[in-house]
Amino acid sequence: QSTIGQMRVPFTIDAHRSPHQQYFANRSFIAKQVGNVRDVGAAVGYNVNVGFPIILEAGLFNGSGLTNQKDYWTKGTNYSAKAQFLLPCGLNVVGSIQKVKPSDVTVTMYDGGLTFHHKQLLIEAEYLYKHYSKDAFEGVHAFDGFINYDFLMKKGPLQKISALARYDFMSNHSNGKRYENSNGESVLKVNDYKRSRITSGITLSFAKPFISDVRINFEKYFYAKNSI
C-alpha cells in the first residue's frame, strides 16, 4: 500500500484519527497541539500476520505542513514511522517516531500508546515526548487517557449512547520556529502553555437513515499559576 500527496502523517494514535473517528468534541492536546501534523509527501504501508496482525507505516514528508510549500525538501529529510501490534486479547500496542525541522532546530517526537477494546468497552492511554536539538527548548511531555462505554439501543432512532471520560496533559510547548525576543535574539518561544484537562460527556449515535454522532462534552482546564 502506498500514498502520495496530502495526508495525515502516520504518527500517534489520536492525532492520526480523522474528524469522524474522534471520540470527543474537542481533540486531545496530543492531537491538537503537540502531535497534530498534516503534510505533503509519500508513505508506504505493509501488513504482516505473525499469529496476530502487525501494521507498519513509514513516509518521507515536506516538513512545512499544507500551507507553505517551498524549499523544505532541501533542508533535510523529514520522516515518520509507525507500528501497530493488534494482539488477540483486544489490545492494540502502538509505537511511532517522527522527525521534522521547522527551523534550524530539529524536532524529534516519540509516541507510544495502548488501546484495549472488549465488546462495548474501550480504554486508551497515550504518551508523547518531543525533543528539540541544540537545547533550544525544554522537552515536551504530553499524555492522553480516556474510557468509552457504549450502551446499545435496540429500538428507536439511536443506535447507541456512549458515556466517556478523559484526562489529558501537556507541558510548555513550542512549534519549533524561532521568534525575535525583546533583546533581539532569535529563540523558540512557548506557543502553548502547560495545562491539564478533564473531560466528560455522552455521544448520541443515530441509526439509519440519519447516521451521525452528536457529542455533548464538559471540559475543565487547569493551568499553572501565572502561566497565562
Model features per residue range: what roles?
Residues 63-66, 130:
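A broad detector of the eukaryotic-type serine/threonine protein kinase catalytic domain
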Residues 41, 80, 109-111:
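Conserved positions at the start
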Residues 1-63, 75-77, 84-92, 146-148, ...:
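Outer membrane beta-barrel
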Residues 69-73:
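Active-site cleft segment of glycoside hydrolase catalytic domains centered on the general acid/base Glu
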Residues 3-6, 15-17, 93-228:
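Outer-membrane beta-barrel pore domains
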